[in-house]
Amino acid sequence: MVGKIAPIAVDAMGGDHAPGAIVQGAVNAARKGLPVVLVGPEARVREELARHRAASSLPLEVHPATEVVEMHDHPGQAMRRKKDNSIRVCFDLVASGRAAGMVSAGNSGAVMAGAILVLGRPEGVERPAIVSVLPALKGAPLMLDMGAVVDCRPIHLVQFALMGEVYSRRVHGVTRPRVAILSNGEEDTKGTDLTRAAAAALRRAPIDFVGYCEGRDLLTGEVDVIVTDGFTGNVALKTMEGTAKVVGEYLKRALRSTTVSKIGGLLSRAALEGMKKRIDWREVGGAPLVGVNGVGFISHGRSDALAIENAIRRAGDAARTHFIDEIARAVAPSHALLEVPADGAATEQGPTPRRIAPPRT
């Protein structure tokens, strides 16, 4: 996307490979013209920057933060007691308008707590959600929530759907996103009290709600926004990550098993590299937060320079769309949607939803 924005604030001290990999990713992004401000202990960050040639000529600055949130710290307490920590300072920069968004590979709970504490929520939003972009056969479907709210009520799922629809449309450019709730079957009778209540409400919402989708539909790309509670979403995400790793190892072993397979592997290297890139979580970079008054991205704790660079790029893309302006309007009718009309015309199960089409071959 084009258009100038304020820098993206990057938590230089977040993640297993901080500050080295974080600074490297920020430098890589800055070399491509993306403005970045690194936040952390100034002397340490500048020492790391000095390792990079001509870094002083890049659109990259350093903003001091004297404290760091450790992975074992309690998120809420860390935000309140360590008021000059690098995560909170990143959010302070966003709140003041000096940064267009922030990226952190640090304590994800602290990032969520900091977002709520410093940025606050748009009017009407009950709970923010973490969004994941899935490596589907086509498109870039979103799934939320991925761990922010593990014990959900129907209002949460309804709002996740409405916020996810806005993000898909405004940030990913999907004209009319297809929205579904993750369930154990497509039939109306499937699911739980939670999913059935949310589905009944969403059938009355001004979005393209297509009903339930199953786990097998996650990566087909037939649905643009997949809604679930944070517990289920996180388990599903980790399952997909683990499956991709195991399949990759199986493929590697198979291609090394015989001379013929080794030759076949060499001949198909370009295709295999393309597939590997498609499912590489580092290409996504980070998971955006929706439901807070600012752009925030949570990156994997194992993020390397490539992941951080991509997270910065995606945060910039999101900031340019000003999608947050539409969130409050989108969730405004959510409580009314959950109310059963007095005439009883709309029941909890509602009309039969359209079935999700099988993946195109």
From Swiss-Prot:
Listed GO biological process terms: fatty acid biosynthetic process; phospholipid biosynthetic process
Keywords: Cytoplasm, Lipid biosynthesis, Lipid metabolism, Phospholipid biosynthesis, Phospholipid metabolism, Transferase
Reaction equations catalysed: a fatty acyl-[ACP] + phosphate = an acyl phosphate + holo-[ACP]
Biological or metabolic pathway of the protein: Lipid metabolism; phospholipid metabolism
Record family assignment: Belongs to the PlsX family.
Record-given protein name: Phosphate acyltransferase
EC number: 2.3.1.274
Gene name for this UniProt entry: plsX
Annotated segments matching region Disordered: 340-361
Principal place of residence: cytoplasm
Cellular-component GO terms for this entry: cytoplasm
